[in-house]
Structure formats: structure tokens, C-alpha cells
Design a protein with these regions (language model features):
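Alpha/beta-hydrolase superfamily serine-hydrolase fold, recognizing
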Residues: 25-343
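Gram-negative bacterial Sec-dependent N-terminal signal peptides
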Residues: 1-21
């Protein structure tokens, strides 16, 4: 097996677990789209836990998996930019649509990957789809990954970029008064937390938040975790591994900036409109939907949609880009961005 293919195999291994699952074998589960089943069959060939495998750096594992599928990266131009704000220096990537009508707003994107395996390289296709579909300028936060730093570093870096964008958007040709924030998986966690933080700190104003298959609680103990926590790309054990590094102190996990689901109704009041996307066969499904309900109970305008037949991070995975559920979710997200950011 050559090096590239080896890393593709490790990508599947990185997200497997030995926990028993209540759901049927994903290879035969009729609730899963056939294209998704084929993807799972390929990555499930190696069942070794990610953290026991050698790798030059964790991000290379997901990047190798993503690189296996050719994708369309046309219609955008991307530049790297390092910003300094609030005493923090953060690398970002600025992605501009080639076709722009008027002055665009900003889509601040916070990536997933359990704070370990994500980066711009393996998330750029998703950001490209959101930028082209919405017509807004994307700003990708390349926060410090685990284990180099833990909470609140990654969130504070994201807030620093949000603040910089609101004050310096003219430098990238955007309107800093129109900002949406989006994130997938733990990026969805930090999108929710950043919305709370911006409210608590009286700005910058966020006009729209998009939580894609978000992690909203550190407990790792919902019904969907136990039902779908093995064999479906993201595992319960891998999430627990990430949480133990990100927020090792149990007391810290009660902080709404760590577990947004534990925020009080009062704390959630006044948050920006939200789109919460979940997947039927995803360990994070229950907590994402519970957070959407809690937002609604707090009077927040929220659209919550579960996409059946698919798995965690389906919007991110290049191999699933042309599956109807992925296309529909991205179309829904970009429509929401346009609705809330386009004057």
C-alpha cells in the first residue's frame, strides 16, 4: 500500500471505535443512503483507533481522505492572511467569490475535526461551496489545534478574528457590519459559543449562525452517541478523546462556551438567528437537536433540519459532495446566508 492510500485507510481508522453499537451494521443498514454505505465500507476496512496510529501530524489523515476525491474549486480566489487582535495572532484564509454583486458581507468559518484533524486544506471545498453559493467573502480561522492548546484558546482566537473582521473588513473588500458565522462539528460548537461570547461582550454583531452537525455538550452520553457511535465515520471514543484534551477539567464542561447546551434560557435570549443541521446516523444528532429546541424556547429564530440517510460531517466529506442530502444542506445554508446578509 503506498503512502497516500495508507493515510486514506488511517482516515477511516481515525474515526472508528470498539464500542458496541445499537444500530445495524452500516454495511447493511437500509436507513443509510447507498452512496454513504459504500463510503463507510471503504473507510471501515481499518478499525484501529486513531490515537494509537503513527502519523506525521493528525491533519494529514483527514487531508488524505479528502484528497482522494477530485472537487470543484473554481469561482474563488484565496489568500493567506495573519491577523493580530486582542493580543492574539491568528492565521486566516480569505476566500473571495469571483462573481460579486455590490459589497459582500463576511462568512466567518470555524472548522471541525475534533480540534485535532481539521484545517483549511481539508475544509476548503466546503468553504468554497458556501462562498460561491452565498456571494459573501469567506474568512477561515486556522485556530491552534490540540494538543498544542486547549479551551479557551481556540475560541478566543476565533473571537479575535471576529473582532478583526468587524473593524477591518474594508481591507478585504467586505462590509464588517454584515457577518455570519458557520462551523461544522466542533466548529459548530465554537460557532454557538462565539455567538454567546459576542452577545456577552456586546459585540461584534453576528447576523446569522450556522451550526452544521454541531457538538453542543461535552457529556458524550446521548442515545445517538450509543446508537451511532461506531462504524459511521465519527466515533464516540474519538469525540471523548478530543473532549478530554480540549476541556479536561470536568467543572469547565459546565461553561456554556464549552457546552452551549448547558446555557440557561436567559443566556440564550437575544442570540442571532440560527440554522441547525443534523444527520440521522450521527452521534451528535441528539445534542444538536436539543440545542435547537433550547434556542427556540429562548425566543431565537431557528431552523432545525435533520438530513436522513447520511452521517456526521456529510457536508464536509468530498466523497459525499454529490449525494442529494449534501447538496440540499449546502443549498439551505447558502440561502440562509443570503437571506440574512444581503441587503
Amino acid at each position: 500500500m503506498n503512502k497516500t492510500l495508507k493515510f486514506v485507510a488511517l482516515a477511516g481508522a481515525s474515526l472508528m471505535t470498539s464500542f458496541a453499537a445499537a444500530a445495524p451494521n452500516p454495511a447493511t443498514d437500509a436507513r443509510i443512503d447507498p452512496h454513504v454505505r459504500a463510503f463507510l465500507a471503504e473507510i471501515n476496512k481499518d478499525s484501529s483507533p486513531f490515537w494509537e496510529l503513527p502519523q506525521p501530524k493528525p491533519q494529514d489523515i483527514l487531508t488524505a481522505l479528502q484528497s482522494k476525491t477530485p472537487v470543484d474549486m473554481s469561482g474563488v480566489t484565496t489568500t493567506e492572511k495573519t491577523i493580530t487582535e486582542n493580543g492574539r495572532t491568528v492565521k486566516t484564509y480569505i476566500m473571495k467569490p469571483e462573481k460579486v454583486s455590490g459589497k459582500p458581507g463576511v462568512l466567518l468559518f470555524i472548522h471541525g475535526g475534533v480540534w485535532l484533524v481539521g484545517n483549511f486544506q481539508n475544509h476548503q471545498r466546503l468553504l468554497r461551496d458556501l462562498v460561491v453559493g452565498s456571494g459573501q467573502i469567506g474568512v477561515f480561522v486556522e485556530y491552534t489545534p490540540l494538543p498544542a492548546a486547549k479551551f479557551p484558546t481556540q475560541l478566543e482566537e476565533s473571537y479575535a478574528v471576529l473582532k478583526w473582521v468587524s473593524e477591518h473588513a474594508e481591507e478585504i473588500g467586505a462590509d464588517g457590519g454584515r457577518i455570519a458565522v458557520a462551523g461544522n462539528s466542533v466548529g459548530g460548537n465554537m460557532t454557538a459559543a462565539l455567538s454567546l461570547m459576542a452577545k456577552d461582550r456586546n459585540g461584534p454583531k453576528i447576523g446569522y449562525q450556522i451550526l452544521m452537525i454541531p457538538a453542543t455538550d461535552a457529556s458524550v452520553d446521548t442515545k445517538s452517541y450509543h446508537e451511532y457511535g461506531t462504524g459511521r465515520f465519527l466515533s464516540r471514543s474519538f469525540m471523548k478523546y478530543g473532549w478530554d484534551l480540549y476541556a479536561p477539567d470536568e467543572a469547565t464542561r459546565n461553561n456554556p462556551y464549552v457546552s452551549p447546551l448547558r446555557a440557561s434560557t436567559e443566556q440564550l435570549k437575544g442570540l442571532p438567528p440560527a440554522l441547525v443541521i443534523t444527520a440521522e446516523n450521527c452521534p451528535l444528532r441528539d445534542e444538536g437537536e436539543a440545542y435547537a429546541r433550547k434556542l427556540k424556547d429562548a425566543g431565537v429564530q431557528v431552523d432545525a433540519v435533520r438530513y436522513n440517510g447520511t452521517i456526521h460531517d456529510f457536508v464536509l466529506l468530498n466523497a459525499l459532495r454529490n449525494v442529494p442530502s449534501t447538496q440540499a444542506a449546502i443549498a439551505q445554508a447558502t440561502a440562509g446566508i443570503r437571506e440574512h446578509l444581503v441587503p
